[in-house]
Every structure is written in C-alpha cells, then in structure tokens.
C-alpha cells in the first residue's frame, strides 16, 4: 500500500507542544534514512506498475525497480526535468486527449486536485493529488507553522497568488488543517486590497513574498494612514522567492511589520522547510515523504550532501499516489547544512540560492540575482532596494560590465550619490567579484512586484 499515513498526525497537539508531530520531526537522522529507504523501494515499484511514463523511463535507463538495491544505484537513475514532464504531458494530450494519462499513477476517480508549477520559464507542469496526497501536504504545512508558533485561534492573511500557484490553495488548506483561520485575499487585487483586509481582519500572521512584503510596508502609510507595524502582526512568513533568509531583508521586514520573520518553502507537494529562531537555514521538515539530493547544475553529477554543500535540488516523493516525482529537478539551487542546530532539532537545513536558469555568467563568475539584491539591501535607505539587471540578450552569458538599474533613495543626489555609487561598486566587486555599471533612477520608477519578483530585464522584451 503506497498511501502510508503512519507518520501523519491524527488530531492536533496540545497548544503548549513545540512540534506538531514530535515523534517524526525529532526522529534521529539514521532512523529517518531507514524509513526513507523502505518507502523509496515501495514508491519505485508503485510508479513502475502504475505509470506508462515511468515504465518507459526505467526501461530506457536499462533498469527495473528491483535493480535499485542501494542509494548509490538510485543516484544512477536519470534525472527528470520540467521539460521531460511537459513533453509527457503534451504527448499524452495529443495521443489520448488526456494531459494526465502518461504520468498519473492513481486511478482517476481518486484524484481530487490538480496543481501546477508556476510556469515562469515555460508551460506550467501539472501534477495530480489524491486525498492521501492532500493529507500529506496539509501535515507539512502544519509542521512548519506550528513550530513557528501559529496555533488554533490565530488568523493568517494569505498574500500569495491564488491563481493555480502551488502556494495558493494548498497553503490555505494547510493553515486550516492546523486549526488557524486563513484570510485568502491573494495578491491579484493589488496591495491596496491586501492592506484593507489586513486592517479589517487584524491577522496575527501574513504570508507573502519578501518583495511584496516590503511593498506593503512602503504602501501602508498612504493606504491606511498608519505604519504596517501598528496593525499588531506577530509573524511574517516569507515564501516564493529568495530573500527571507537574508539578514538585511529579514531586518527590514521585521522592522516594517513589527513581527518575527520566518523564511519557508513548500506549496502543494512533498518538499517543505522553514527557518527556526536561529536563522541558520531552513529545517527540512518533510523527510519522511521526500528524499533530497544535490547535483551539479548542467552535468547532473551527484554532489555529496555535506555541511555547506551547494547544488541543484533533486527531489523524490515518498508514499505519494497521484503524480509522484522521482529524481525530479525543477531548477532550484540550494546550499545545505548537516551539522547540529542551536535549536536542538536534528536533520538537514537548507537555503535557496536561486534558480539554475536565473544564473548569469559574467567574465567566468557565476552570479544569481538574489546575491545582487542581498548586497543592495545593505545600502537601504540610500537605495530603495528596487533594481533591475539589464541584459542586451538573454543569459546566462553576460557581456561585461554587468548593467544595474537601481533606484536611489529619497534625497540622495549629487556628491552623496557619487559616494554611494563608489561604495556600491566596491561592495559588488569584493563580495561578488563583479564590477557593475550603475544607472540611477528616481524612487518609485521601477514597478513593484505582487508575485515573484523579476530582477532581470532583457532589452527589447515585451
């Protein structure tokens, strides 16, 4: 039976308990690894038996599930990419009139939800969930928010996109599963609507991208006539883009909201993580339902998961019925830590560095837009924090110098602006090994993001 609920909690814990499911979340690493291996063997057999796509995937690799008799053998299986999944989706639609027929493993009458990746770099990739899979997702959201302090009786304002975004409906359902109330305002109505509902509902918690969170801080005085920190918000949960773990961005969010800030990841699937008060990486909370690997971007060669290792994230879902991903990569580059955490909890921690397809190469230096943002944040309020990397043509290779369009802070002009530019260029050179050419624009010039921030602009696009 693939729908193994043995590590899902039944009923809610006492509000005084620190963890939603302590028997699983505090499981020693060696015991968790044994559990993963047992579930992996069942998962591989299940997808082979249930999916024409996965049978072909195994056959083309010259392997069968029973051949995967070690973790090393598992890493020799091919890596699935979004392109592979999109192609299977298109082929199934063309051949059968059914976009789900090739990769869905569960009987269709057991499917209760269709999720999709964001589709920011192409056609959205669809994946299906059964009621069991939804229960797994709900559990993982509850684990994250419970350990951050959210409890039944609290109210969370959901300010992420609700339009097929994996952090939309699934996240809202997870909040309800914990026993808290959700205000699913979303971002599609803009910042004014979000702020008005924050005033009306007085939530204790808000979830949004870091960029949109900072935009709310900026807009609140004009919209509500008060600072956002005056609304009594206690938690801000950052999601959807890198930034929530960056000390400078976290500090601005803490000050703007008057709240504790937690970075976290995980929407409608089995990969979930959240920071603890130590802010030394996000704790991987879903290891009982997801195997995490690292590989070299571009080559797919395994990267040992050791303290400080960095690589492209590869995930495999465990005890998952609908559309289980096996050795799937969606392009996220992460850094991991395996040593003890000051909070006392075992297991792996990680931070999201960026997306592999967002990486730029400037004179041989690999550069993620999030790293540029992190340096700029250190100069706030002399800069607003809003910027664009301007490219003559799509990356990853960039003809030097790297062009930055940066909003200056209010009142920063003349000699003060010249000094700021010299300091900024020096910091970029020292920290990122890149010397940019800076174009200054007035405060408020660049569009403010409502969903995931777009920091790269290709001249002539649109």
Model-found features: residue ranges?
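Conserved helix-loop-beta element of the AMP-binding
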Residues: 155-157, 223-243
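ATP-dependent adenylate-forming carboxylate-activation enzymes
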Residues: 182-198, 368-371
